[in-house]
Protein backbone atom coordinates (compact mmCIF):
# COMPACT_ATOMS: atom_id res chain seq x y z
CA UNK A 1 0.00 0.00 0.00
CA UNK A 2 1.46 3.33 -1.19
CA UNK A 3 5.13 2.29 -0.89
CA UNK A 4 6.53 -0.80 -2.52
CA UNK A 5 8.68 -3.43 -0.86
CA UNK A 6 10.99 -6.17 -2.03
CA UNK A 7 9.23 -8.71 0.22
CA UNK A 8 8.60 -11.79 -1.97
CA UNK A 9 5.13 -12.57 -0.55
CA UNK A 10 3.37 -9.43 -1.77
CA UNK A 11 0.32 -10.29 -3.84
CA UNK A 12 -0.49 -6.73 -4.98
CA UNK A 13 0.99 -3.25 -4.75
CA UNK A 14 -1.62 -0.48 -4.47
CA UNK A 15 -0.36 3.02 -5.17
CA UNK A 16 -0.29 6.13 -7.29
CA UNK A 17 1.90 5.72 -10.35
CA UNK A 18 4.68 7.87 -8.93
CA UNK A 19 6.75 7.79 -12.10
CA UNK A 20 3.93 9.00 -14.34
CA UNK A 21 2.76 11.61 -11.85
CA UNK A 22 6.28 13.02 -11.31
CA UNK A 23 6.72 13.19 -15.09
CA UNK A 24 3.50 15.20 -15.30
CA UNK A 25 4.69 17.42 -12.43
CA UNK A 26 7.88 18.13 -14.40
CA UNK A 27 5.84 19.05 -17.47
CA UNK A 28 3.58 21.37 -15.46
CA UNK A 29 6.49 23.11 -13.75
CA UNK A 30 8.35 23.51 -17.05
CA UNK A 31 5.22 25.01 -18.60
CA UNK A 32 4.80 27.47 -15.72
CA UNK A 33 8.47 28.47 -16.04
CA UNK A 34 8.27 29.07 -19.77
CA UNK A 35 10.52 26.03 -20.30
CA UNK A 36 13.66 27.81 -19.05
CA UNK A 37 15.43 28.62 -15.81
CA UNK A 38 16.81 27.01 -12.69
CA UNK A 39 14.95 24.46 -10.56
CA UNK A 40 15.44 23.16 -7.03
CA UNK A 41 13.97 19.89 -5.82
CA UNK A 42 12.76 19.43 -2.25
CA UNK A 43 12.46 15.72 -1.45
CA UNK A 44 11.00 14.19 1.71
CA UNK A 45 13.92 11.78 1.95
CA UNK A 46 16.67 10.09 -0.02
CA UNK A 47 15.83 6.48 0.81
CA UNK A 48 12.16 5.66 0.32
CA UNK A 49 11.15 4.09 -2.95
CA UNK A 50 8.39 6.67 -3.40
CA UNK A 51 10.82 9.60 -3.08
CA UNK A 52 13.41 7.96 -5.32
CA UNK A 53 10.85 7.16 -8.01
CA UNK A 54 9.45 10.69 -7.95
CA UNK A 55 12.89 12.27 -8.03
CA UNK A 56 14.22 10.04 -10.82
CA UNK A 57 11.15 10.51 -13.02
CA UNK A 58 11.08 14.28 -12.49
CA UNK A 59 14.80 14.68 -13.21
CA UNK A 60 14.64 12.37 -16.23
CA UNK A 61 11.74 14.30 -17.76
CA UNK A 62 13.39 17.69 -17.23
CA UNK A 63 16.75 16.53 -18.58
CA UNK A 64 15.34 14.72 -21.61
CA UNK A 65 12.68 17.23 -22.63
CA UNK A 66 13.63 20.71 -21.43
CA UNK A 67 17.21 21.63 -22.40
CA UNK A 68 16.83 25.20 -21.10
CA UNK A 69 15.95 24.10 -17.56
CA UNK A 70 18.76 23.30 -15.14
CA UNK A 71 18.34 21.45 -11.86
CA UNK A 72 20.71 23.32 -9.55
CA UNK A 73 20.01 21.62 -6.21
CA UNK A 74 18.22 18.64 -4.73
CA UNK A 75 17.49 18.94 -1.02
CA UNK A 76 16.69 15.70 0.83
CA UNK A 77 15.05 16.39 4.17
CA UNK A 78 16.76 13.39 5.79
CA UNK A 79 20.21 14.77 4.92
CA UNK A 80 19.92 18.05 6.78
CA UNK A 81 23.15 17.42 8.72
CA UNK A 82 25.09 17.25 5.46
CA UNK A 83 23.69 20.64 4.47
CA UNK A 84 24.45 22.11 7.89
CA UNK A 85 28.08 21.02 7.62
CA UNK A 86 28.25 22.35 4.07
CA UNK A 87 26.95 25.71 5.32
CA UNK A 88 29.55 25.83 8.09
CA UNK A 89 32.36 25.20 5.60
CA UNK A 90 31.15 27.50 2.83
CA UNK A 91 30.08 30.38 5.05
CA UNK A 92 32.99 30.02 7.51
CA UNK A 93 30.58 30.50 10.39
CA UNK A 94 31.31 29.88 14.05
CA UNK A 95 27.94 28.17 14.50
CA UNK A 96 27.75 24.50 15.35
CA UNK A 97 25.63 22.21 13.19
CA UNK A 98 23.23 21.61 16.08
CA UNK A 99 22.53 25.36 16.25
CA UNK A 100 21.53 25.67 12.59
CA UNK A 101 17.82 25.34 11.91
CA UNK A 102 16.19 23.82 8.85
CA UNK A 103 14.86 27.29 8.01
CA UNK A 104 18.44 28.57 7.90
CA UNK A 105 19.41 25.69 5.60
CA UNK A 106 16.58 26.54 3.21
CA UNK A 107 17.53 30.23 3.36
CA UNK A 108 21.10 29.22 2.51
CA UNK A 109 19.97 27.18 -0.51
CA UNK A 110 17.94 30.08 -1.91
CA UNK A 111 20.83 32.49 -1.26
CA UNK A 112 23.22 30.06 -2.97
CA UNK A 113 20.88 29.90 -5.99
CA UNK A 114 19.32 33.38 -6.27
CA UNK A 115 18.08 32.76 -9.82
CA UNK A 116 15.86 29.80 -8.97
CA UNK A 117 12.72 30.07 -11.02
CA UNK A 118 10.94 26.84 -10.03
CA UNK A 119 10.65 24.36 -7.17
CA UNK A 120 9.40 20.78 -7.10
CA UNK A 121 8.22 19.47 -3.72
CA UNK A 122 7.79 15.70 -3.37
CA UNK A 123 5.26 15.78 -0.53
CA UNK A 124 3.35 18.15 1.75
CA UNK A 125 6.25 18.50 4.22
CA UNK A 126 8.61 19.51 1.42
CA UNK A 127 5.95 21.88 0.11
CA UNK A 128 5.73 23.57 3.52
CA UNK A 129 9.49 24.26 3.43
CA UNK A 130 9.16 26.13 0.15
CA UNK A 131 6.00 27.99 1.19
CA UNK A 132 7.61 29.04 4.47
CA UNK A 133 10.62 30.35 2.54
CA UNK A 134 8.30 32.40 0.34
CA UNK A 135 6.82 34.01 3.44
CA UNK A 136 10.14 34.62 5.22
CA UNK A 137 12.26 35.85 2.32
CA UNK A 138 9.72 37.18 -0.15
CA UNK A 139 10.82 34.84 -2.93
CA UNK A 140 8.30 33.70 -5.50
CA UNK A 141 9.38 30.70 -7.55
CA UNK A 142 6.90 28.66 -9.52
CA UNK A 143 5.98 25.64 -7.38
CA UNK A 144 4.59 22.23 -8.26
CA UNK A 145 4.32 19.52 -5.64
CA UNK A 146 2.54 16.54 -4.18
CA UNK A 147 -0.26 16.09 -1.69
CA UNK A 148 -3.18 18.23 -0.74
CA UNK A 149 -3.89 19.52 2.72
CA UNK A 150 -5.52 22.71 4.00
CA UNK A 151 -2.31 24.75 3.69
CA UNK A 152 -1.55 23.64 0.15
CA UNK A 153 -5.15 24.23 -0.97
CA UNK A 154 -5.06 27.73 0.51
CA UNK A 155 -1.71 28.39 -1.21
CA UNK A 156 -3.07 27.06 -4.51
CA UNK A 157 -6.13 29.33 -4.28
CA UNK A 158 -3.86 32.29 -3.44
CA UNK A 159 -1.70 31.60 -6.49
CA UNK A 160 1.40 30.67 -4.46
CA UNK A 161 1.44 27.12 -5.87
CA UNK A 162 1.25 26.49 -9.59
CA UNK A 163 0.27 22.84 -9.47
CA UNK A 164 -0.48 19.96 -7.13
CA UNK A 165 -0.32 16.24 -7.76
CA UNK A 166 -3.24 15.01 -5.69
CA UNK A 167 -3.37 11.36 -4.77
CA UNK A 168 -6.49 9.38 -3.99
CA UNK A 169 -6.12 8.06 -0.42
CA UNK A 170 -9.71 6.77 -0.32
CA UNK A 171 -9.11 4.89 -3.57
CA UNK A 172 -5.83 3.51 -2.21
CA UNK A 173 -7.48 2.29 0.96
CA UNK A 174 -10.43 0.81 -0.90
CA UNK A 175 -8.23 -0.95 -3.47
CA UNK A 176 -5.89 -2.22 -0.74
CA UNK A 177 -8.86 -3.63 1.20
CA UNK A 178 -10.19 -5.39 -1.90
CA UNK A 179 -6.71 -6.73 -2.77
CA UNK A 180 -6.28 -7.97 0.82
CA UNK A 181 -9.64 -9.75 0.75
CA UNK A 182 -8.82 -11.32 -2.62
CA UNK A 183 -5.45 -12.48 -1.29
CA UNK A 184 -7.10 -13.99 1.81
CA UNK A 185 -9.53 -15.87 -0.45
CA UNK A 186 -6.67 -17.06 -2.71
CA UNK A 187 -8.09 -15.10 -5.61
CA UNK A 188 -5.79 -13.40 -8.11
CA UNK A 189 -4.71 -9.77 -7.94
CA UNK A 190 -3.05 -7.41 -10.35
CA UNK A 191 0.61 -7.03 -9.39
CA UNK A 192 0.21 -3.22 -9.46
CA UNK A 193 -3.06 -1.41 -8.81
CA UNK A 194 -2.81 2.21 -9.96
CA UNK A 195 -5.12 4.38 -7.87
CA UNK A 196 -4.66 7.48 -10.01
Question: Which residues does each PLM region occupy?
Answer:
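Loop/turn elements at helix/coil->beta-strand transitions in domains of secreted/extracellular proteins
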Residues: 9-10, 34-38, 65-72, 113-118, ...
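Short beta-strand->loop
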Residues: 15, 40-50, 75-78
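Soluble non-cytosolic domains of exported or imported proteins
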Residues: 16-20, 49-53, 96-100, 121-125, ...
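Hinge/cleft segment of the Venus flytrap/periplasmic-binding protein
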Residues: 50, 61-72, 171-196
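Hydrophobic alpha-helical
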Residues: 58, 78-155
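Extracellular/periplasmic ligand-binding modules, especially the Venus flytrap/periplasmic-binding
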Residues: 122-131, 157, 167-185
Amino acid sequence: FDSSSDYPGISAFVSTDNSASATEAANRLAEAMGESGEVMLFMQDSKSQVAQTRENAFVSQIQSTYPNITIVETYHMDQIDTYKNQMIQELATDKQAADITEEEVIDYLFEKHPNVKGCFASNSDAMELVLDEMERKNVSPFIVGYDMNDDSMEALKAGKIDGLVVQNPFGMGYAATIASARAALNMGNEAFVNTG
